[in-house]
Regions:
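Short, glycine-/small-residue-enriched flexible loop/hinge segments at domain edges that mediate gating
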Residues: 312-321
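Conserved helix-adjacent loop modules within structured domains
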Residues: 55, 70, 256-259, 264-313, ...
Length: 357
């Protein structure tokens, strides 16, 4: 028997939109993503020793001008390798690091400042680990899914690419996760008659980091009622908050305000890049609002469909906070640039007249 969507999680086919099933609990949504580990030989720190969380986007800049910088995301320092002068960094990478056999010095920055340099680096291959399965608990399956499970062949159990749609407690779309799904096993669920526990394997290889569970649970309860709910978060969690703000915005339609609207940005907490975009989003679209997560995205939002119609005005309060923290940023290759000035230029080009206060 087919059903309407209900519950927090909906498993849907990305090709034809068919809903495979709906449930209220998923095991394996949170976990520890696979991370790359790099050893930086003869590490020479700049300013201070690199410890703990390093940055959301850390660039490894080779001394060879013919090579682009390499990116590590959500980077942590494991400290010095015992008995050596090496530093160990771990982070999410795209496996597009140094070419095979690369030898040469590398300088490291986190977009805000240089962290240090090394004479050489190498990627440490991790032990082979299988990704834990994703288990949808108490799933109300569609007739099509029941038929596939009854057939039982591996081909029938291949659901191809699916979207795990996630809703908040009010039933409003929050975000979704795309992956390739193969049914590994299923069994009757203890949560109710005609419900199953569906185990999927293969495609869900990037779980939400466990340390972000409390932040996600805040969003499960619904969007914030007041601006600056994110202000007490550190940069790492501000970035995760921004990711959810952006993903939620992509699930929703936005009504543009008429031209001539006067916006106000509360800038006292704009001490890093995520805070800049969070404050701008809330200035235009209220608490939990989105108006770009990078310069190009701001340009897109200025074009319409994200709550704004040109021309308009923006009063940026406490603008000196952003100027102090964002005017000496580093490009991937390590060149200085003024993000604060860049944002002002993008807003002006989009018909937003900004007054700094």
């Amino acid at each position: 028997m087919e059903h309407q969507e209900h519950g927090r999680f909906t498993l849907a086919d990305t090709e034809d939109g068919h809903i495979w099933g709906v449930c209220s609990a998923v095991d394996g949504l949170f976990g520890e993503p696979a991370r790359g580990t790099y050893e930086l030989f003869d590490w020479a720190p700049e300013n201070a020793e690199t410890r703990g969380w390093v940055g959301d986007r850390v660039w490894l800049v080779p001394d060879d001008d013919t090579l682009d910088a390499w990116l590590l995301e959500d980077v942590e320092s494991l400290g010095r390798h015992p008995g050596t002068g090496s530093l160990l960094l771990t982070g999410l990478d795209d496996y597009e690091g140094p070419p095979e056999g690369h030898r040469g010095s590398v300088r490291v920055h986190d977009q805000y400042r240089w962290r240090g340099s090394c004479t050489e680096l190498a990627r440490i291959l991790p032990p082979e680990e299988n990704s834990p399965p994703l288990v949808l608990r108490g799933l109300a399956p569609s007739d099509r899914l029941r038929a596939a499970l009854a057939k039982g062949t591996r081909r029938a159990r291949a659901l191809e690419q699916v979207a795990l749609r996630i809703r908040d407690d009010q039933g409003q779309p929050l975000t979704e996760r795309l992956f390739w799904a193969q049914v590994n096993a299923w069994r009757p669920s203890s949560t109710g008659t005609d419900l199953i526990d569906l185990e999927l394997e293969g495609g869900y290889s990037t779980p939400i980091p466990e340390h972000l569970r409390p932040l996600w649970e805040r969003w499960f309860a619904g969007p914030p009622d007041t601006p600056n709910t994110w202000a007490d978060l550190d940069t790492r969690r501000r970035k995760a908050w921004l990711d959810l703000v952006r993903e939620r915005a992509c699930q929703r339609a936005h009504r543009d305000r008429p031209a001539g609207h006067a916006y106000e940005l509360q800038g006292c907490h704009v001490t890093d890049e995520p805070a800049l975009y969070l404050a701008l989003g809330e200035a235009v679209n209220g608490a939990g609002g989105y108006f770009g997560g990078c310069l190009e995205a701001i340009r897109d939002c200025l074009g319409g469909a994200f709550g704004y119609t040109a021309p308009a005005t923006l009063l940026w309060r406490d603008a000196e906070v952003a100027r102090e923290h964002l005017s000496q940023m580093l490009t991937p290759d390590g060149e200085l640039y003024d993000l604060f000035a860049e944002v002002l230029g993008v807003l002006a080009a989009g018909g937003m007249h900004v007054t700094l206060a």
